[in-house]
Amino acid sequence: QMPPIPMDPNVRVGKLENGLTYYIRHNNYPEGQANFYIAQKVGSVIEEENQRGLAHFLEHMCFNGTEKFPGNGVVKNLESIGVKFGADLNAYTSIDETVYNIDNVPMSVAGAVDSCLWILHDWAGALLLEDEDIDKERGVIHEEWRQRNTAQQRMMEAVAKKMYPGNRYGDRFPIGTMEVVDNFPYQALKDYYEKWYRPDQQAIVVVGDINVDEVEAKVKSIFADLTMPENPAERVYYPVADNKEPIIALAQDKEQQYGIVYLFAKHEAIPNEAKGDMQYLILDYAKAMFAQMMGARMNELAMDPDAPFVEGMVNDGEFFLAKTKGAVNGYVVPKGGMTMEATATLYREMLRAQRHGFTESEYERARAGYLSSLESAFNERRQKFSLALDILVVLAFYHYPYDRLGSGRSDNHSALA
């Protein structure tokens, strides 16, 4: 058994009786500002067929009125203290999660912390979801769907069905279907909200030039009234099966100006419970080295004027859209008329790495670059503006075991909408 990963003692972590988890950290860069996040550990993959698009729709509705901030109150309140809608105030829905952020909040404004925490609170459990507002938002979603209906999006949706046969990951893109968006009953959205927006699936992250003790006390007070539904539904993490024969998925679109070839070699994903010890860090380092060395090989090949591809990459990570399956992922952008040759080159390089590994000099170059980037990150850790997002990703989304954190302790998303 490897020892646990050392945790940052400056991150205050707690869990309320209702199941909500919070992460709070002081960081004085930028000075006088703070970031507030709420993570919902649910996304479009949990939608039933007649709910496709509701996770994303609900995200939009969070800016259309809450109990304490009716109408346009959320936006008006935050803009009054210097937070800009879109730039500082935003949200996203992905297949597995939904995240809301309030960034660059000036701490010099009286009541700013309270306002932001109450907005997070109302997003978590006090949306109004008025019928008239829902109907207005249907048109907004339609326009977003129209703008996102690109050749790449259409092809991705087409191949996903083949890559995930009989699996929700094959058709649960956050934007949903316009048939559902146009016709779902008002109560369907309210039922979805009450079923899934609940404390055990939520996390609060506050990072910035703050007093940690004061913010923690406010979180405990403000969020304590959130309640769990009776007989809460299980949050299922849908597995992805292996396939006995290679899956070949082809898609074409008249608007797509160049081709892309992907190769995936699936393997088991790292279980969440195994992500809290040093073995996971060692594996993460090995993956980083693999990606850098493969990247160097592919870049060198692409520089040859006779190369059949313009660019290529190989790494190890998630299998396309699914967090529940890992894969060695490779892609190339072939030159015109050279798709088969480019595919063969990619496959050859993946096999060469598998069978023969890498040279010592390749490893030393990759390691030197990696250590240099680590040193830079360490030296700039106090100035890292995205610290709140890092905490969110590592702890809230990778489900680091809470009981391993201790009472004092303690980051594309794919297919975003």
What are these regions (language model features)?
Residues 64-66, 91-96, 112-119, 123, ...:
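Scaffold signal of the M16-like zinc-metallopeptidase fold and its non-catalytic homologs
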Residues 2-37:
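Mature N-terminal segment immediately following signal peptide/propeptide cleavage
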Residues 203-259, 368, 372-378:
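An aromatic/glycine/proline-enriched structural segment found at the starts
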Residues 261, 268, 280-360:
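Structured mid-domain segments that build the active-site/substrate or prosthetic-cofactor binding neighborhood
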